[in-house]
Amino acid sequence: MIESLIALIAAIVGLGIGYLVAKKINDAKYEIFVEQAKAKAKAIEYEAELILKDAKNSILNAELEVKKKYEEKTHKIQKDFNQKFDDLSKKEQKLQQEEEKLKEDKEYLCKSQKHIQNLQSDVDKLKNKYQEKLDDVLKILEHSTGLTQNEAKEIILKKVEENSREQIAHIVRKYEEEAKNEAKRKANFIIAQATSRFAGEFAAERLINVINIKNDELKGRIIGKEGRNVKTLEMVLGVDIIIDDTPGAIIVSCFNLYRRAIATKVIELLVEDGRIQPARIEEIHEKVCKEFDSAILEEGETIVMDLGLNKIHPEIVKLIGKLKYRASYGQNALAHSLEVAHLAGIIAAECGGDENLARRAGILHDIGKALTHDFEGSHVDLGAELCKRYKEHPVVINAIYAHHGHEEATSIESAAVCAADTLSAARPGARREVLEAFLKRVSELEDIAKSKEGIKNAYAINAGREIRVIANAQLVNDDESVLLAKEIAAEIQEKMQYPGEIKVNVIRELRAVEYAK
């Protein structure tokens, strides 16, 4: 019994001790768990602080970026606003100047009207004075002569009319002279303004081009066997080729600037290539002609763009470029037309006209000169017909006619073109009359030869002392060539005046070409 009790007590004591030990262990684990939880909480809190800090930095950077963009945009808007404000201020200033000018004109008009009213008042007073005198004279006449009042009135009125007419004529002449002087003063001022705002360049056109040659061997190859190459060059190119003892130089002479420029380019390419023979000459000539056509169009487009013009037909643009190879009285036609365009624009603007339209009329006023080598007629008629065909502005057509006196100028722009044309032509050194007379004679010489049937082309060479005529071998035989030369010589002798004699050289060449396949 006692043993059982002792065992029970021991069991109870063991359970108590086990409970205490277990509780102690659990308490220790709990404390460890709590510490771990606290550590994790601190780690999470630290990580959250880092995330929050990064978020704040991102928000701050975003705010700075937005602020920077806002400031840049605000600065740009402010700059645009300032620019527009400046432009508006300039326009407002210009408007104020125009208003002041209108005000001055209005004041001048009011003064003129007042002056006219004063004159009218003076005239009325004179009329009253003459009427009083007339009444007195009528009474005297009635008593002294026994004339009726109507008869006396006729005598007096006739006398008064003669006296009044003299006085009125004197007044009219006075104000007409004042108006002319004022108009002349304003015209001189406008011309001075135009010429001071434009500074053009001028270089007189020559009749020769000099081509540099490396050595005399190349000269011999250009001449060819028995002069075959140089003859082919002169016949194909229509120029004079002068090869003398001058070292390192060949001279190309021709009054036609376009032919001379093409000839110079062809010879330069042949010298560079080294293959100089008739077939190669014709091949290079055809190639250069195509290149010049493209270059002429580009030149015209550049000029139209520089002048700020638009909607000009491509054919007219090409002819503008072709003016570069035309000359009048030694003055390059393109340089002259550009000068007229700029001056006409300035003059028209000063007179209250359309500056762009005046420039357009100025560049086209001599456009017919680009056609005179290919068509019959004056450059005025050719240019006007061309502009009518391509529906140019009526002011342009009127300017073409008016600048040579074929029509009266009907607008400010046309009058500006006429004035600019006169200014450009009258400038000292701008033109050479003697050279132009020579060029005209040489051109007439070619025209006479080309007017005959069966003629392919004609070139005046040797300073107009020889005309080389290329006949169509299929239309003209050998016998007809002789007659053709005599006819041309007779017509030249009949229609032209020239010193010495002119040689007429008719060339008939038949070529047969076939290809072996």
Swiss-Prot record:
Q: Name one GO cellular component term.
A: plasma membrane
Which GO molecular function annotation, any one, does this entry have? RNA endonuclease activity
TM spans (from-to): 1-21
HD domain: residues covered: 333-426
Q: What's in the keyword line of the UniProt record?
A: Cell membrane, Endonuclease, Hydrolase, Membrane, Nuclease, RNA-binding, Transmembrane, Transmembrane helix
Biological processes per GO annotation: mRNA catabolic process
Q: Where in the cell is it found?
A: Cell membrane
Please give the Pfam families that the UniProt record associates with this protein. Answer: HD (PF01966), RNase_Y_N (PF12072)
Q: Which SUPFAM superfamilies match?
A: Eukaryotic type KH-domain (KH-domain type I), HD-domain/PDEase-like
Q: Which InterPro entries match?
A: HD/PDEase_dom (IPR003607), HD_domain (IPR006674), HDIG_dom (IPR006675), KH_dom_type_1_sf (IPR036612), Ribonuclease_Y (IPR017705), RNase_Y_N (IPR022711)
Q: Which family does it belong to?
A: Belongs to the RNase Y family.
Any idea what job this protein has?
Endoribonuclease that initiates mRNA decay.
Name of the protein this chain belongs to? Ribonuclease Y
Gene name linked to the record: rny
